[in-house]
A protein has these predicted regions:
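N-terminal membrane-anchoring alpha-helices
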Residues: 2-49
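Domain-level recognition of soluble alpha/beta enzyme cores
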Residues: 32-129, 317-321
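Primarily recognizes the serine-hydrolase "nucleophile elbow" in alpha/beta-hydrolase
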Residues: 204-262
Length: 345
């Protein structure tokens, strides 16, 4: 019971404390409910005519002293059956799950994908796309896009950037390489070194794929696309490897050296607005560009497929006000159209 002589400051403090306590209680209730929810997260199903296979390979680049874990999504033979791939398998998946807040660890491990583990590949030849993730991410975080593209006939090489993927990359023999926590992207020289390393990884993956007898691929070049820093690298890669004939950037800013204009087709898709550094190539017609006013940065990843079950506001997770699965389908459609469609021969 407050009396007339109670200081206003005390009343205000009590009121604010009560509001804070209620907010904390509501927040805890949401988190508890979310963590007790055992429903698995099911990613959107691919829409194309082909079943999708996936293999995970450990490739060593002796020339550059690099080792890479590469996710390969591809069209499988008609009628292919078998166990589904794990979203991120084994110890790597467990390590990733421990650090993927606010998603409870067991929920990340139970994400349901459509690709069949180690399924026999269709006879091909298949057009090839390189997929580069955002900084700190791994290609599996873009499974929805990769599976949809593969179901329409593309072979998608998701290259994990060793030393940049966080918290770590776990290799087939169990050893791990931790990712740099604070890459110096504001230093143009340091950023350019990363651009060259990631682009070198993409080129090596193309070299190594050509020696993999499981896949028959088209020889007339490859496309490359990525999200965030991976999208930035994709555009740079056009000038670094003549085999890359087209590149798409999903909401990535420009880092490293100024972009070299090669005359090769580019596509730039941004959340909310076109970044200032891309306005010149967009205006000149050097790049095909589009912005999505209601989308945020992480809507270009699988995170868009399950934001409604997060117990915190989507904006805090860099997620916008879009229908996540529908948005990803639209991005996949744009990628497929830009890279020319795919028909197995």
């Amino acid at each position: 019971m407050f009396h007339a002589g109670t200081p206003l400051r005390s009343l205000l403090w009590v009121t604010l404390s009560a509001i804070a306590a209620v907010a904390v209680a509501i927040g805890i209730a949401f988190v508890v409910r979310y963590r007790l929810d055992d429903r698995p997260i099911v990613l959107p199903r691919p829409r194309g005519p082909h079943p999708v296979g996936r293999v995970l390979v450990d490739w060593k680049d002796a020339r550059r002293n690099r080792e890479l874990m590469v996710f390969i999504w591809y069209p499988a033979v008609d009628g292919a059956t078998g166990p589904r791939s794990e979203y991120i398998p084994g110890e790597w998946g467990r390590l990733e799950a421990e650090h993927m807040l606010p998603i409870p660890a067991k929920r990340l491990e139970q994400i349901e994908v459509s690709s069949i583990r180690d399924a026999q590949a269709a006879s091909g030849p298949m057009p090839v796309l390189i997929l580069l993730p955002g900084m700190g991410r791994v290609p599996a975080h873009y499974t929805t896009l990769a599976e949809d593209l593969a179901s329409y006939g593309f072979l998608v090489l998701g290259v994990t950037p060793t030393g940049s993927a966080r918290p770590a990359v776990v290799f087939s023999d169990g050893h791990r390489v931790e990712g740099e926590k604070k890459p110096r992207l504001d230093d143009p020289a340091a950023a350019q070194r990363l651009v060259e390393t990631w682009a070198g990884d993409a080129s090596f993956a193309l070299d190594r794929l050509a020696r993999d007898s499981r896949f028959v691929v088209r020889q007339e070049g490859a496309g490359i696309f990525g999200h965030s820093f991976g999208g930035n690298v994709s555009l740079h890669a056009l000038a670094m490897d003549p085999r890359f004939t087209r590149a798409a950037n999903l909401d990535g800013s420009l880092y490293g050296d100024p972009l070299s204009m090669t005359g090769k087709p580019m596509m730039i898709l941004c959340g909310e607005v076109i970044d200032d550094e891309w306005k010149a190539p967009c205006a000149s017609g050097a790049a095909t560009c589009a912005a999505f006013p209601n989308a945020e940065h992480m809507d270009f990843s699988d995170a868009a497929a399950y934001p409604s079950r997060f117990p915190i506001p989507k904006r805090m997770l860099l997620l916008g006000n879009v229908d996540g699965p529908e948005f990803l389908r639209g991005i996949a459609d744009r990628l497929r159209a830009f890279f020319g469609g795919a028909r197995l021969q």
